[in-house]
Amino acid sequence: TGEREALAHGRLLVLVNDGSLRNLIPAELAKGFGFLQSKPASGFSPVAVTPDELGAEWRDGKVHRPLVTHLNGALFGRPDAGVDMTFSFGQLVAHLAKTRDLCAGTIVGSGTVSNRENGGPGRPASEGGVGYSCIAEQRTVETILAGRPSTPFMRFGDRVRIEMTDELGRSIFGAIDQRVRGPA
């Protein structure tokens, strides 16, 4: 399947928050089961849209709009989803289809939305940059630049809100709004 043909099979676009429970990952990997207990259920936006609904913001198999993330009410990031996206959805789907059949309902994620700055890592939104969509990425950049991370991982009670709006500020997909809860 070529990239153009693969892209034509994509029917709906949706936002996804694929979180990780970072403190559980090492022990889970040691058990040999992979990320089983360290990957909670993903959060999905309440609305899926067809690519044509995005108009000019959908081009080259990418969504060209800022993905806005707030952490505990403060802006954490607003990187443009189409800028610095390594592979288009056409490329991703074509690559996946090389070794498997992709049936109706298959969800293909593009990975973390991130933008570079001047050829290097981005800057936090709190420092005037576009920020990040992933706490682990911000912590990695902090470690590279300062020798250690300063941004904590989310804790019980913390809240994340992820949304993409159109040029008039209207929500395109609705918001993913999640709070970290303790064990049931």
How would you name each of these model-derived features?
Residues 1-95, 99, 123, 133-136, ...:
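Glycine-enriched loop-and-adjacent helix/strand subsegments that border the catalytic/binding cleft
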